[in-house]
């Protein structure tokens, strides 16, 4: 018989994994997530072709790319590695959250499963798992760090080399996975050290400092080197440039930024707040409170890259614990006349909110989205997409993209170049060699074409949607580009200077 003590940990791993498989199956052979195709595919392919220096390797916080490149070298294609890995990451995140609730907070198995499922299946958590794999990998180790930070060795409180070495390794893994989550975990650690110095054991505080030093030094090395990798650059303030990417994510002023963040918070978490606010005073866990405070502090910093709204999404994890504690409070309230507890009402409400929103997010298409995510209701479609069934293009445009690129490969001559927006860059690298592709990021393809012409290319091509159907704030292309091939709503254009 299956040991009962393993039932809830198994559920914490298997349920999120199986749910995350759903959009992968519906997408067929294509990956899920903008960053998946826009960044993870091309970066992994470039690494496999030797296109990374030692310093760039360190600067990217390379743990995820080491995994994807290693698995691809072991025999899997990059695309299939990035179809299988997201489900596994979400499963391990559920298990890590369960472990923290069980061992770090001392909750019962039944209670511990609730934050593990809410923190992986609520639509905001699924949005993180849609393409933020580096953050997700870091969060797995984040909760391992918190568990080791709080749990006493063997319950005795004595010094344990194993626990502190594991703590140091897990902390380093966070830093090697994602810089934003690294800042949060180091912030929680700093608050914990200060608290121990003031209220508890100074010896424990010194031990934490000593065993944190390797990760701290690694963090500063990555921070120092990160400007060498353009896609991981930090952008603060309110840029006035007309760069296409900044036009989508930048703010005109500080009040506009705060208003956008407040609206985004309510859009994401209003369904969870009725339960979460019940435990604001009851749930006094120092690490979760520190987690929330640090995220709120980060949202006050005028930041465009990484997006401040993506940082707000990380509140789903502490709020999952607060909502669970809110349910515990409802357990003590009874309606004697109706023989029903508010706990049951709260559980049904939480299940309905999670299932309805998440299922709609996973199975509806971008062209026919669930009402809560459609444009007009959702003013944040560049952060919360209309559906999970897309990557850099909609599920309905994936085959057209493959057809267009294959046609161009069959018909492109020697001294030619393909111009690609970040949207089509990963797609192009799965078909062409890197030296046949010119990435112009989120900018103007006409400027890129002018540059390519000056570099001596005889034929300059562009892949984009047919005119009037373009995404990312560019519905049409310049008249200097003439359509020469179309598949569905995806077209190949040839540059002809006016």
PLM region spans:
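Membrane-interface helix-loop-helix junctions at transmembrane boundaries of multi-pass membrane enzymes
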Residues: 2-5, 156-160, 197-210, 273-295, ...
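Start-transfer (signal-anchor) and selected internal transmembrane alpha helices
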Residues: 1-22, 207, 341-349
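Membrane-interface transmembrane helices that cradle and orient dolichyl/undecaprenyl
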Residues: 105, 142-163, 280-283
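Hydrophobic/aromatic-rich transmembrane helices and adjacent perimembrane loops
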Residues: 135, 183-184, 306-341, 346
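Active-site lumenal/periplasmic loops and adjacent helix-entry segments of GT-C-fold
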Residues: 9, 13-140, 385-395
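Transmembrane catalytic cores of multi-pass membrane glycosyltransferases
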Residues: 20, 24, 35, 59-61, ...
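Transmembrane alpha-helix segments characteristic
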Residues: 10-17, 208-217, 281-304, 312, ...
């Amino acid at each position: 018989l299956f040991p009962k003590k393993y039932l809830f940990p198994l559920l914490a791993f298997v349920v999120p994994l199986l749910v995350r498989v759903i959009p992968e199956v519906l997408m067929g052979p294509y990956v899920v997530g903008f960053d998946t195709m826009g960044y993870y595919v091309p970066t992994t392919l470039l690494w496999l072709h030797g296109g990374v220096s030692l310093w760039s390797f360190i600067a990217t916080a390379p743990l995820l790319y080491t995994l994807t490149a290693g698995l691809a070298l072991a025999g899997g294609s990059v695309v299939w590695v990035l179809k299988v890995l997201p489900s596994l990451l979400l499963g391990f995140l559920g298990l890590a959250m369960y472990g923290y609730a069980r061992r770090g907070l001392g909750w019962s198995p039944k209670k511990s499963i609730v934050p593990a499922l809410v923190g992986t299946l609520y639509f905001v958590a699924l949005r993180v798992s849609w393409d933020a794999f580096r953050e997700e990998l870091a969060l797995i180790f984040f909760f391992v760090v918190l568990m080791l930070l709080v749990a006493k060795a063997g319950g005795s409180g004595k010094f344990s080399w194993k626990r502190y070495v594991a703590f140091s390794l897990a902390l380093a893994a966070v830093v090697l996975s994602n810089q934003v989550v690294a800042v949060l975990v180091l912030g929680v650690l700093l608050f914990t050290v200060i608290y121990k110095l003031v209220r508890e054991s100074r010896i424990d505080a010194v031990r934490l400092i000593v065993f944190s030093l390797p990760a701290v030094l690694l963090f500063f090395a990555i921070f120092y080197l990160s400007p060498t990798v353009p896609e991981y650059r930090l952008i603060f303030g309110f840029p006035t440039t007309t760069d296409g990417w900044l036009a989508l994510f930048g703010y005109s002023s500080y009040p506009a930024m705060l208003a956008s963040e407040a609206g985004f918070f309510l859009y994401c978490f209003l369904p969870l707040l009725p339960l979460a606010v019940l435990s604001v005073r009851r749930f006094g866990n120092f690490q979760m409170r520190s987690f929330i405070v640090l995220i709120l502090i980060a949202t006050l910093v005028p930041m465009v890259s990484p997006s401040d709204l993506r940082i707000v999404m990380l509140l789903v994890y502490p709020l999952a614990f607060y909502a669970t504690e809110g349910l515990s409070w409802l357990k003590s309230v009874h309606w004697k006349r109706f023989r029903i507890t508010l706990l049951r009402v709260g559980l049904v409400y939480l299940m309905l909110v999670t299932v309805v929103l998440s299922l709609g997010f996973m199975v509806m298409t971008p062209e026919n989205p669930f009402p809560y995510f459609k444009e007009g209701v959702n003013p944040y479609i560049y952060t919360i997409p209309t559906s999970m069934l897309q990557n850099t293009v909609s599920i309905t445009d994936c085959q057209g993209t493959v057809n267009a690129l294959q046609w161009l490969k069959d018909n492109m001559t020697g001294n030619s170049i393909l111009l690609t927006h970040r949207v089509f860059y990963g797609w192009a690298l799965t078909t062409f060699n890197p030296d046949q592709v010119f990435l112009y990021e989120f900018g103007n393809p006409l400027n890129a074409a002018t540059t390519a012409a000056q570099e001596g290319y005889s034929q300059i091509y562009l892949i984009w949607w047919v005119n009037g159907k373009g995404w990312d704030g560019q519905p049409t292309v310049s008249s200097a580009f003439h359509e020469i091939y179309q598949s569905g709503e995806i077209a190949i254009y040839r540059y002809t200077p006016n």
